[in-house]
């Protein structure tokens, strides 16, 4: 990302980044595409990482990096990073509910973040890197149930990531989309520097 810290990291690296499913449904990698589409929105710090985590899941049709939760329409990345917009980095996940359920997506999301950090994620700290699940009224029961199950694993008092009401999602600039896939060396260097894997093991175990 173009934030000063990450820019420095990239240059320094020679420009090199829970609970068991509770729903029973005909889901899985072997299921055929039903043509149905639903949308989920997750904020887990750096949207490069969140997007990459979801786009490899069977049943996920698309993952788009962007912003949610704020007051400014069609914000730019620089506006969000500077602050004052109320937005946080988020990813909109489009999925086939016949292949993967919303609950399964939320369960997976917890395992890719540190939900005990109120100030950001890993080396990305600040208001724009806060975590959240943005859920519609229909999605909220599954999201809340998943949150309770995940919190029980690590201690409810430590678990700070909220389930928030669904709001409008704004896509980020084109150069942020598919960043991990298109820039594997740069993203890999960023991810290692941030210590994502080690921290996730510390929070969730092996």
Protein language model annotation of sequence segments:
Residues 1-8:
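Bacterial N-terminal signal peptides that target proteins for export
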């Amino acid at each position: 990302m173009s934030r000063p810290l990450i820019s420095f990291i990239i240059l320094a690296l020679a420009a090199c980044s829970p609970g068991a499913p509770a729903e029973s449904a005909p889901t899985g990698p072997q299921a055929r595409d039903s043509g149905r589409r639903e949308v989920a929105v997750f904020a887990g710090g750096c949207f490069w990482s969140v997007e990459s985590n979801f786009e490899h899941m069977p049943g996920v049709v698309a993952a788009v990096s962007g912003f949610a939760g704020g007051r400014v329409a069609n914000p730019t990345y620089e506006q969000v990073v500077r602050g004052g917009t109320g937005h946080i980095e988020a990813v909109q996940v489009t999925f086939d509910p016949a292949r993967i359920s919303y609950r399964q997506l939320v369960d997976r999301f917890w395992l890719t973040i540190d939900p005990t950090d109120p100030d950001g994620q890993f080396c990305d700290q600040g208001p724009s890197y806060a975590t959240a699940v943005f859920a519609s009224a229909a999605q909220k029961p599954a999201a809340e149930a998943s949150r309770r199950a995940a919190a029980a694993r690590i201690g409810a008092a430590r678990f700070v990531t909220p389930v928030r009401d669904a709001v409008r999602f704004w896509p980020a600039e084109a150069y942020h989309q598919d960043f991990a896939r298109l820039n594997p060396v740069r993203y890999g260097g960023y991810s290692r520097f941030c210590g994502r894997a080690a921290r996730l093991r510390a929070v969730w175990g092996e």
